[in-house]
């Protein structure tokens, strides 16, 4: 159990059968009446964000999460197979469990998988990864009327917008949180 007075950004709690992460919190002490804690909670499973108010000192069940560092080994019949590098146990995850990060997975990549009561809650990819451009239109010199970017398909099948000077075969860094181009990789 955790007191609502101890809430911090990133604290995970169990509420109504779901696991929630505290995104924002504010301790309020009105001049009249008792103190309370106003929070913004994000569901780890669905991503929904709700606002909830707790009485000051109210006890809430803290969610106990396990974080494992797993390496993506291969894909078999639609399932992504990961291996725990310390115990060599295999874990199979579907693309729904991995979420939007599945398009960036390549063999040998290490990810953090967060478990709650033995069930996968989320898969954390590295913030930036380096991938090879496999398909893109050639950049025409002086063609900047469209904003200076063009679509490119990467080695994993992901599509990102890149500057006009990027060509097929180049290695680029991509931000996995918002699918944005970060720069060339030497």
UniProtKB/Swiss-Prot annotation:
GO biological process: peptide biosynthetic process
Any Gene Ontology CC annotation: cytoplasm
Alphabetic keyword roster: Cytoplasm, Elongation factor, Protein biosynthesis
Protein family according to the UniProt entry: Belongs to the elongation factor P family.
HAMAP family: EF_P
NCBIfam families (UniProt xref): efp, PRK00529.1
The protein's name in its UniProt record: Elongation factor P
Species this chain originates from: Prochlorococcus marinus (strain MIT 9215)
Gene that encodes the chain: efp
């Amino acid at each position: 159990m955790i007191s609502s007075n101890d809430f911090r950004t990133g604290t995970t709690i169990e509420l109504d059968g779901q696991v929630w992460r505290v995104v924002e919190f504010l301790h309020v002490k009105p001049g009249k009446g008792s103190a309370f804690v106003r929070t913004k909670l994000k569901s780890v499973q669905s991503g929904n964000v709700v606002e909830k108010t707790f009485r000051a000192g109210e006890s809430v069940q803290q969610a106990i999460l396990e974080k494992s560092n797993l390496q993506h080994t291969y894909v078999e019949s639609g399932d992504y197979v990961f291996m725990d590098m310390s115990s060599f146990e295999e874990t199979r995850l579907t693309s729904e469990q991995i979420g939007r990060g599945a398009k960036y997975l390549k063999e040998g990549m290490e990810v953090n998988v967060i478990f709650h009561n033995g069930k996968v809650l989320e898969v954390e990819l590295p913030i930036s990864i380096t991938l090879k451009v496999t398909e893109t239109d050639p950049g025409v010199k002086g063609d900047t009327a469209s904003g200076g970017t063009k679509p490119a398909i990467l080695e994993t099948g992901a599509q990102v917008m890149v500057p006009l000077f990027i060509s097929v075969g180049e290695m680029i860094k991509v931000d996995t949180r918002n699918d944005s181009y970060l720069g060339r990789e030497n």
